[in-house]
């Protein structure tokens, strides 16, 4: 009888179907650094992580919106010991050769042009060039500054996207 029960359990487990509810990818993004100085994003002087790019005509470039990363607590942590060091802002997300791609809106060929404005060498952030070096001491003064512009493509519609950033001090 015991053997019959074991055989029945094995047979039933082989016949049971499996179901998968959902699957996807998770990206983990972080830094290990000898110095820490947390930054907060500011747009037009206001602390926020939302950059409102406004409205732009098809095939046109929108207004420049300033985006600056400043020390959350300029007098705390290691923020005061950054003189002579480099702060690297690395970006990840839907980067293309032109900039940051649209992820959820209908304007599928539009993108954001994100350009550093007070880096050691100002540059556009793209898939092939996604890290920008700054004089680290700027984090407690003018900040690590960028400008963002919406570049409209030929398709009209809304634009929604997100990009992750990480600041490393060396």
Please place each PLM-identified region on the residue numbering.
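Gram-negative bacterial Sec-dependent N-terminal signal peptides
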Residues: 1-21
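Mature extracellular/passenger domains of Gram-negative fimbrial/pilin and adhesin proteins
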Residues: 3, 20-170
